[in-house]
């Protein structure tokens, strides 16, 4: 199952908070979809299963963004025990690239000695016997390694940029930080740029 974010280019109808809350037919269609999602089993993350009200939040947000709510749901998580819904950086990247008032997509320039990072990981075995990978480099290898993310907003002539060092990426909950750190840093850069 692909977890890439599907977007639509719907220029004919804008769905926003007002239209969702004041258009009874639209609201009911979204509520029906949220009930379908809540009962769709493994097609949605565990934090949405059996919870149509939680699914409604995703369905409404996906409608505002012009995206598939099932794909959006796959890119969410609950922050600790707070009940706060978080969006994965890949989703934020898709939203920014499809909706931001920029002249084009966000660009990336990599700098530093990435050869000390990319492809260097160590395979480990969990207590349950499952294999996983972790970074095989040290914090010293991260020194001076980073990315410059930039894009020019419509109506402006100079790009807005964000410089993000690999060492600034403190939360690395995915094994993708070991296998594809450049991609992970790019997603984080877009999230912070936005």
PLM regions and their residue ranges:
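Glycine-rich anion-binding surface patch
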Residues: 2-194
């Amino acid at each position: 199952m692909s977890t890439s974010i599907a977007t639509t280019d719907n220029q004919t109808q804008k769905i926003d908070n007002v239209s969702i809350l004041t258009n009874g037919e639209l609201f009911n269609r979204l509520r029906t979809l949220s009930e379908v999602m809540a009962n769709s089993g493994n097609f949605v993350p565990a934090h949405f299963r059996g919870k149509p009200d939680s699914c409604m939040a995703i369905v409404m947000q996906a409608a505002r963004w012009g995206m598939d709510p099932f794909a959006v749901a796959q890119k969410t998580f609950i922050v600790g025990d707070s009940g706060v819904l978080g969006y994965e950086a890949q989703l934020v990247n898709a939203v920014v690239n499809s909706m931001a008032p920029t002249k084009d997509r966000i660009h990336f320039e990599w700098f530093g000695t990435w050869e000390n990072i990319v492809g260097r990981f160590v395979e480990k075995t969990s207590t349950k016997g499952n294999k996983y990978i972790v970074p095989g480099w040290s914090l010293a290898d991260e020194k001076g390694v980073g990315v410059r993310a930039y894009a020019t907003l419509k109506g402006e002539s100079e790009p807005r940029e964000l410089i993000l060092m690999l060492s600034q990426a403190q939360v690395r909950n995915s094994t993708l930080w070991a296998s594809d750190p450049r991609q992970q840093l790019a997603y984080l850069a877009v999230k912070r740029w936005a």
